[in-house]
Amino acid sequence: MGRIIGIDLGTTNSCVAVLDGGKARVIENAEGDRTTPSVIAYTQDGETLVGQPAKRQAVTNPTNTVFAIKRLIGRRFEDEEVQRDIGIMPFKIVKADNGDAWVEAGGEKRAAPQISAEILKKMKKTAEDFLGEAVTEAVITVPAYFNDSQRQATKDAGRIAGLEVKRIINEPTAAALAYGMDKNRGENIVAVYDLGGGTFDLSIIEIDEVEGEHTFEVLATNGDTHLGGEDFDNRVINYLVAEFKKDQGLDLKTDPLAMQRVKEAAEKAKIELSSAQSTEVNLPYVTADATGPKHMNVKLTRAKLESLVEDLVTKSIEPLKRALADADLSVSDINDIILVGGQTRMPLVQKTVAEFFGKEPRKDVNPDEAVAVGAAIQGGVLAGDVKDVLLLDVSPLSLGIETMGSVMTALIEKNTTIPTKKSQTFSTAEDNQSAVTIHVLQGERKRSSDNKSLGQFNLEGIRPAQRGTPQIEVTFDVDADGILHVSAKDKDTGKEQKITIQASSGLSDEEVEQMIRDAEAHAEDDKKFEELVATRNQADAMVHGTRKQIEEAGDALPSEDKEAIEAAVVDLETAIKSDKKDEIEAKTQALAEKSQKLMEIAQAKAQQGSADAGEQQQSAKQDDDVVDAEFEEVKDDK
């Protein structure tokens, strides 16, 4: 078995590590750097450049130089943040035939996993040059808050790069592995604050020593899949462009070459201000007009930078609070804070985190390399080179299906330890229903349309029967990569249908954030909706039951009573279609009152049936050949 390498596939930079002599080692690339810019360029002569060479030529080839591709992976073109990125990216983001967000560069339309694969190929080659052998297996990291589609798309990128992805591991969990492997202090609860180039994650992880086994258990995770260093850069870019327009009266946003230079200068200024109090952005000949060349000269202080990005830093605090609440912990329960991701080098970020937790974050973790190191350790665990390490990660969002009344019924709750498998039995909503549609959802809301649709499939060939009779077993299986597999089985016929949720779309920043925020802010709305659905279902059952009783009563029910009851049934059916709970309840009550005669007929028939049964029993007692039998009453749970 060959070595399993660990790859941190980052938005801004990527990193590769491998277990070497029992220790995880970060590998330097061909340029001698320990991290590689996640930049890909397609040149005029058909060459593909990756990393520093691609970044160096970006100024002269902005429309064919792709960066921050991780922000598009597993996403739909129509997603709000994709639309937002279209306005600021110099390269062209286009809509693929399947609705995904693709990139047009080098005269071709390319999928995000395809472009990401170029970075992974570079990481693979870097490892092969160091090890002197072929590498075919890898552990790749993703943000903890990546959804099913984004994880699938990342695995696809690995496959395109010629790698068998042995495991997808969450970035904060990988960082905790890197930090905790050499710590033998018993129970230790750490908060991993991971603010990278394009994503933000927060995980609460318990590191413990149990009977000689190192356990890393994720207690809760939260985050924002569209918040990172790129957003900080964009604030600086917008400020520089606005200052230049104020000074020169020219809008640089119409000039791709100028914008690429401004982007590089903004990133450089942001980094410099982590150690300096002020810096100057000097870009001679940044553009020109009829009067001649124009130069940019803008002074930027740390205080100004902090005022530009303060709300972005504050935005990261809400997920912290939610993760602590989900883990049922308070700030005082956290022993250590680990900062991961290049953006955490910013003093304002460090200060904000320290103020929230009431203690300074640890300084002994390299924010750029910890994730790749953790991935390499996990690779060692999978290869059997690292013993006595148990990693318990979680599913970041609830997973379920749409049930009667457009309700999201969760089979796997958020923050459930993975891998996990859960089955639940459902039934049909109509008489003689021969097929059911299994609609798979991800999110925290009760109403199915308020959650993210991951996919749907049909289970056909169900034997005709009364509603509520067929037994359909739905099974959700989340593997160690956090990828969902769903199956539905008709217990009667044994027919089964399976689906692995395909990477057809990604969760938008707005969708993911809103799912949990809305679930909290609209708890009252959700409760009212649940009550409305319960009332509707109860009324629907009454309509169905009443119609059946009318049929069974036959001629025993006077025609005038029958007409009155049928009119009440129609009234209730009309009410069920509305959103007025009180009206549905009133019409249900009206039908119950009108159906009094039906009840009397049903009771009379039941009494007659009991009398007949009594006579048969008496007759049976007189028979010498008596057989005792046990019976069990089975009630349908509708």
From Swiss-Prot:
Bias (Polar residues) ranges: 605-620
Annotated InterPro entries: ATPase_NBD, Chaperone_DnaK, Heat_shock_70_CS, HSP70_C_sf, HSP70_peptide-bd_sf, Hsp_70_fam
Compositionally biased tracts (Acidic residues): 625-638
Record keywords: ATP-binding, Chaperone, Nucleotide-binding, Phosphoprotein, Stress response
Keyword Lyase: no
PROSITE patterns on file: HSP70_1, HSP70_2, HSP70_3
Entries under PANTHER family matching the protein: HEAT SHOCK PROTEIN 70KDA
Entry function: Acts as a chaperone.
NCBIfam families the UniProt entry points to: PRK00290.1, PRK05183.1, prok_dnaK
Name listed for the protein in its UniProt record: Chaperone protein DnaK
